[in-house]
């Protein structure tokens, strides 16, 4: 069989392409869904797909302290069709962010992100709290339902040069 330079080059390019595809798929790490909350720390290419998250704080639980559906820190990745909601308990006063993203780059594709205050708690918090992060959102819904005039619920808090597009 004659050594064909074009065939040889095409074969080598195919091998390189296949190797790059394997590396790319190895870097993209699927994140396990947990209905009470997801934490992503120090991951590059993290992917959370079709997950419903509703963190809860027991009625007798602390009225202060962190409560988040998704915490992403020092990471990059995608959230695809994630439904993250927080129903504020009656005793909850402060320090919650449904989505807490710090030092990360995230693409959000689809999903519903919501805060409800059915117990009319005198509460404050954020739907999205971004700290030194870049977030790009596509086809997502952001909902806040609160009838208590004393509570302060905000959709977005952008801190430390964060960017939301």
Predicted feature descriptions by range:
Residues 1-27:
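Gram-negative bacterial Sec-dependent N-terminal signal peptides
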Residues 27-28, 46:
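Disulfide-bonded cysteine motifs in exported proteins
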Residues 31-39, 54-71, 85-100, 115-132, ...:
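Extracellular beta-strand/beta-solenoid scaffold signature
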Residues 44-46, 70-77, 105-106, 135, ...:
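Beta-strand repeat architectures
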Residues 45-53, 76, 112:
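Acidic, glycine-rich low-complexity segments
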